Amino acid sequence: MPEYQINGITVNFPFEPYQVQRDYMSRVIECLQNSTNGVLESPTGTGKTLSLLCSSLAWVLHKKAQVQANMRTNITDLKEFEMVQRKKLGGDGGSGMEELLDKLHDGCGPEGAKWGVPKIVYASRTHSQLTQVMQEMKNTSYSFMKGVILGSRDQLCIHPEVSKEEGNSTKTNLCKAKVQSRTCSFYSRVESCKERPEVVSNVIMDIEDLVKVGTKVRACPFFLSKELIESADILFMPYNYLLDPKARKANNLEISNTIIILDEAHNVEKMCEESASMQIRSTDIALCIDDVTSIMKVMDHSVAIPEDDETKKDFTIDDLALLKEMLLQLEKTVDSIPVMFSQGGNTFPGTYIFEIFEKANIKEGNYHIIAQLLENIIQYIATITEKNNFVRRGGGLQILAEALSIIFAGSGPEYRASIDKCYKVHIEIEEQKKTRGNVKQADGWTATKQLVPSVKANAKVVSFWCFNPGFGMRQLLGRNARSIILTSGTLAPLKPLISELDIPIAVRLENPHIIDGSQVCVKIVGQGPDKESLNSSYGNRDNPKYISSLGRTILSFCPIIPGGLLVFFPSYPLLNKCQEAWQETGIWAQISRTKPIFVEPRGKDQFLNTMSEYYQKINDPDGKGAVFMAVCRGKVSEGLDFADMNGRAVIITGLPFPPLKDARVILKKKYLQEVRTRENEIISGDEWYSLEAARAVNQAIGRVIRHKNDYGAILLCDNRFHNHRQKSQLSSWIQKHLNTNQHQNFGPIIGELSRFFRNAEKILPQSKLSRNIVTLVQEPTPLIECNIPGALIVNRDTKRKLDDIRNNFVQIENSNQVTSTFRISDYEQAPSQSASNEPKNFLSRLNTQVHSIDFNDMTTYSMPSSSQGALVGIHKRERSTGSDNSIFSQTQTATQKKRKVVLIPQQVINLTSDDEDPGRTGDDPTRQAPEDRVELIKVIKTSIPLAKYQAFLSTLTNYNKDRNFDRLMEGLLVAFDRPELYYLLRAMRRFVKGDHEARFDAKIKEVCGR
């Protein structure tokens, strides 16, 4: 791999770095050389991760060599000193020194080189983001350096009993109990297996690697990862492992002389605040009391619960009685706090939290004893629940333990002064639950058998909120971290970020993007195709006209945008509201006919499945791409890669401001106003509020344009983006390409967007994926004529349908056109062809583009009278090659200038109804389907509704790929669901695989009776 000298350090980089990459690596090395902190912004697609890894690991290697050389020099000096001493002492007095020198010399090897060499801690928001980074490291010249990821028991545990439990907290406490009682064989094998070849040979191990290796050697991956920390050059972990004091302690993280890299650092402010905050409810305290009481009853009445090493208690009934007394007093104290319900609660200084707990005799002096008692009780509950079906699960105790660890994270007057400055205590009425059931925490700790106490009228919620992210960052600096580097594609503006973090920043960088104007099209879309203003403000988002216009805007963009389209909403409620409204009005179905729609789910498993299905649609050579509707700050907007055809455009439907009336938001704005001075450059509350929305937008935009050859469109569909403040808070590289016309109509935007993609497809390199999605075009076929004598008179329903077609820009493909001949080899997925080549894939030929009758233009066409076309075909239109500011191409031939429509008497086939044709009464056993497959498809296409025909094609394609006969039959029975279509159903035997023919015949006999 090529080597480059950057700031005196040799860096191996896979290719000649761009200037932005050189600048970035130079700043990283500058931070490490001078032991300073840095804030570095480089847009997504500029190779930020690769540059970060190569520069930091190169510096660590350089430092290792430097330390090793210094050690050898020192050993040489010591040997010379020893020889002098031996001569003075008669030759034998230095035996002890010789032994010491031998040890020093042995330590001068690879292991000795680690002495004094900083370790890198690479933190990001999620494990999936870290897995991508580790994969990138494996592809560099530094893949020989040791890297390991830290994960939770939920991800790493392979114990058959523990791993089946729901929730990380349950697994954690059950694991601790088994380890303590030495009943986990996987844990017992960690020490003996950590030097096994299977472990040593895996230099870089992510979650999947750890589980795979741990399963192979039958050693616990969770504890194995902790053993590998010492020898690792770089550690990977989520933010909370690093920022949360309790997590740092649990993972034995040593921060001193460590290089801390915080990637995706636009989240760091929020993570710092949240990791230092807590919330506890009266219900949680009541659960604690119930749990303690239940255990006391067990112990007091000597209930026959067998006790072994695993379930042995580390507390007495007197300990429980004392704890219960404290909890009862805490409950009484919280319940007695006066709260103004009309004002949404009361706010107190941060130190008020100590007053609350001190009234229950929980204070700095005895906190550690109480914390240990809580941990012992939680572990005990976990073990007896597993063994004896005990109904308590300790959810409230877990919440209390975590709350105390945050409240008493420090001690002394200085700590209390920081609490008073950075924290607020907010107390509000606890809402009455509408339904009876289980109290489930975010981590799933409280289980299904948990008994839930009723919420009292005077129940409260006590929130202990940190509003200064610098509080957490200073804890890292206070532990003597060598350097802290914050980096992301969306950090700007840097000044307010640096001010809030409250740590010294010596190195700053705002990199430009490496793409040019031909690769990005940025538009502010202030109104929809119906000229309705697009504004997702709180006061307008219930406006049916706005919701409808937004839907039609997305619908209009879909045919123009190739591949994947990402649509981001400000919140889940607004996404759900739009989805429901569009489904009711039919807009959702119209979008789906152009591109299938996927919606971001909240559950982890459903999310992974949805993403997989989305990528499959994008990769489908016969598909039209897909639409993914998601939420700003959601999973899709953070860290996922939608390069190339996976994301050719992103639509931002609004500004994702935090909820204005939320107590935490109100207090954050108030806090900033209180601490803001001219000297500290801290932003105002209103500026912070606006910046929160802008950063979420910038992050969502960053999902597209992921590398130097990528291209895409950014469509800001909210007229508030015209405001100067909102524009100025967009990433600088986006502002550079932003149009300045505030009153640009919808039509010209469509035209410019269409030309942008046509031009990009011509001049920019196309990815491998895009070849699978390129639209196949054939020679244009003549328009189907229809002669209408006199005026065309249509009834109200027909007029409404035509108006709907015109307004919503729907084109239905020519149902009468099938080209070429069919070969079974062509039915299989084949490499795609360029637009100029003859199509080779049978199904893609069925969707080839032809000239169209433009039903959006209600003028009429003049056509030859000799046509034998039996139907009025409404075709997919062919993309215009000229410059066009309209959605639809202009008439391409001179003969079409004078237009009229004439009607030929013809049997009408309803393209949209599933009702039976009255002309057909049932299954005709003598009726035969065409032998030729192409002719058969022609007949099918004209015999069933369009929606069923498209589903039919999808069924055949899937069957050819997965050979799932049951799914094939299910799809065919839906397509041919009437007796008069059974002859077509029987004809489908020619598409069935040989080993499925007998099953097909049996099914046909069952359905058709013959």
UniProtKB/Swiss-Prot annotation:
GO cellular component: a single term: nucleus
GO molecular function: 4 iron, 4 sulfur cluster binding; ATP binding; ATP hydrolysis activity; DNA binding; DNA helicase activity; DNA polymerase binding; metal ion binding
Domain Helicase ATP-binding: 7-333
EC number(s) reported in the record: 5.6.2.-
Binding site for ATP: S42, P43, T44, G45, T46, G47, K48, T49
Pfam families hit by this protein: ARCH_RTEL1 (PF23109), DEAD_2 (PF06733), Helicase_C_2 (PF13307)
Compositional bias of kind Basic and acidic residues: 918-931
Signal peptide bounds: none
Subcellular locations according to the entry: Nucleus
Residues involved in [4Fe-4S] cluster binding: C157, C175, C184, C220
GO process terms (BP): DNA recombination; DNA repair; DNA replication; negative regulation of DNA recombination; negative regulation of t-circle formation; regulation of double-strand break repair via homologous recombination; telomeric loop disassembly
SUPFAM superfamilies per the UniProt record, alphabetical: P-loop containing nucleoside triphosphate hydrolases
Residue ranges of the region described as Disordered: 912-931
Keywords recorded for this protein, A-Z: 4Fe-4S, ATP-binding, DNA damage, DNA repair, DNA-binding, Helicase, Hydrolase, Iron, Iron-sulfur, Isomerase, Metal-binding, Nucleotide-binding, Nucleus
Record InterPro entries: ATP-dep_Helicase_C, DinG/Rad3-like, Helic_SF1/SF2_ATP-bd_DinG/Rad3, Helicase-like_DEXD_c2, P-loop_NTPase, RAD3-like_helicase_DEAD, Rad3/Chl1-like, RTEL1
Swiss-Prot/TrEMBL catalytic activity: ATP + H2O = ADP + phosphate + H(+)
Predominant location: nucleus
Motif (DEAH box): 263-266
Known role: A probable ATP-dependent DNA helicase implicated in DNA repair and the maintenance of genomic stability. Acts as an anti-recombinase to counteract toxic recombination and limit crossover during meiosis. Regulates meiotic recombination and crossover homeostasis by physically dissociating strand invasion events and thereby promotes noncrossover repair by meiotic synthesis dependent strand annealing (SDSA) as well as disassembly of D loop recombination intermediates.
Similarity annotation: Belongs to the helicase family. RAD3/XPD subfamily.
Protein name (Swiss-Prot/TrEMBL): Regulator of telomere elongation helicase 1 homolog
Organism: Aedes aegypti (Yellowfever mosquito)
